[in-house]
Curated annotation (Swiss-Prot):
It comes from Pseudomonas fluorescens (strain SBW25). HAMAP family: FBPase_class1. One of its GO terms (biological process) is sucrose biosynthetic process. InterPro entries: FBPase_C_dom, FBPase_class-1, FBPase_N, FBPtase. GO terms for cellular component: cytosol. Homotetramer. It catalyses: beta-D-fructose 1,6-bisphosphate + H2O = beta-D-fructose 6-phosphate + phosphate. It is found in: Cytoplasm. This is Fructose-1,6-bisphosphatase class 1. CDD domains: FBPase. Pathway: Carbohydrate biosynthesis; gluconeogenesis. Binds 2 magnesium ions per subunit.
Amino acid sequence: MSRVTLSRYLIEQTRSNNTPADLRFLIEVVARACKEISHAVSKGALGGVLGSMGTENVQGEVQKKLDVISNEILLEANEWGGHLAGMASEEMDNAYQIPGKYPKGAYLLVFDPLDGSSNIDINAPVGTIFSVLRCPNEYLSQNEALNEKAFLQPGTEQVAAGYAIYGPQTMLVLTLGDGVKGFTLDREMGSFVLTHEDITIPASTQEFAINMSNQRHWEEPVTRYVGELMAGEEGPLKKNFNMRWVAAMVADVHRILTRGGLFMYPRDSREPSKPGKLRLMYEANPMSFLVEQAGGASTDGHQRILDIQPEGLHQRVAVFLGSKEEVERVTAYHKK
């Protein structure tokens, strides 16, 4: 039986599920950009791409060389195809305007070009996270300047989301709103090949991911909940839990999509004005879309992530996502 490439899968989606052709082409362009980023990441010290730029992004984070390289790869790959009205990146202060010499399309692309970039220099997994939204009609005019408001749509408005993870294999994990598929990069073919047909997160789990070094800064519901996890069989949950932490959301969520688990990045007391560290538009929304499509759940401790109305491109949120039973439990603790 012939293998199903990403291109073939997308063509079949266009035929059977009426996936628009321009969305198909957009996903293929993003996938090609991810292959290029994968190649750059794999060079490491040989390609002179390790280390920092000595600059900070809008988040106040020091930019790694590969952050900037990955951002440029995605911009250059997607600006000319005629599928997009604009782009927004975690690495850029403002929305990216499609140059006037290129046609405008019907979609908006939002991305974190290299999630977990602190892992680059130690050769640990990193990835690219992306989300696709429809552009509001008032911004579709070729002459209409695009501003931040066009992007400020709740996660329920996403038409596609996914990530590429650059680890021992390069994988692209994708949802078009009809389940979650996983594609592995066959470097001999140069194509992403369908290897994970229907990714599903089990409802229960005995594994969680959180940065325990921040424990002293957590709110009481999180302290209580993690204490119960750590208490094991003798505690109120009556079972033992393992903890995992890769320090890259894309890697931790990939593990959860593969075998279940709970990912937590809660609000902490060090910066009370910021409701969390992770970005709603670039990280929380696309990952929440994927997790829900795989049968899991995702909240900020109080409400469903996908229902949050964004107020800014770089808005931050607390995140609890993964196996449904544990997400519901920790969310309930926040409401008591």
